[in-house]
Amino acid sequence: MITAVCILLFLGADLIRPPSVVPTDRGGVVVSAKGGDRRWTANWTMEQLERDGKKAIRFTERGQGHVSPYSEEVKWSLESVWSAENGLRPLESEKVVTTKTGKPLVTERKHFDLNNNTVRFERQFSDGRSETKSLSIPPDTLAVEGIAGILRFLGFDQNARLAAHVLSNEPRLYSVTFETRGMERVKTPAGQFEAYKVEMVPHMGVLSVFRSLFPKAYFWFTVAPPHFWVRYEGPENGPGTPDIVMELDRASE
């Protein structure tokens, strides 16, 4: 799966405040290279659920096409669960990738321990190889799985910035801020929308002078509530991967 940014709820770190009721939503996306060539399509869902008696959000995605780092067309299914108690924080995710004909290629899992601020990353290949890595993470860490659905809850009421860390699938942790860049009218396969443009700005410490060398990433969310995601421009799977344009193909069904 997916207004100026609101003043955030401070809970020891900047966290996005969940709504009292999470809307059930679903739709489709179409992804093209910057040159216009079609790369892949996907269907996604978002719903509220309970996890261990606490409020959570589940995102799913099923896609097919050409996506980095695979040289051939693949299929995948993804499920990601986020805590929605006090602030929105990732709990776990699983992504299963197969060939176009259904032959298993790789399974990726992330499990977040919110009490100890750690994440365990696992990658298992069909030939028996596996990779495991554990990282310490700040409380404001966001996972890429479901991030567009989470950012729609920024609020978009007042000028502000969201400072956070983003965990990629490398896996690597990036310090970023999400900054509003005004409003634009955006045309997508799902229609035309008045949308807020949000830039994801990387922070590189003493290397910030080289920020211009990093690929830019932008998200667009509708001005009209519930501020659903309509467009993304940026790297497909982190630095070094193809720049893409991802658009809403059809709105909620």
Where are these regions (language model features)?
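Terminal leader/tail segments of proteins
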Residues: F121-R123, D249
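Surface-exposed beta-loop interaction hotspot
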Residues: Q124-Q158
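Acidic, serine/threonine-rich low-complexity disordered tracts
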Residues: A13-N116, Q158-E253
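Generic secretory/membrane-interface signal
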Residues: L8, F121, S134, P171-L173
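Intrinsic disorder/low-complexity detector
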Residues: A4, N115-V119, R129, L142
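Bacterial Sec-dependent signal peptides at the C-terminal "C-region" and cleavage site
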Residues: T3-R17
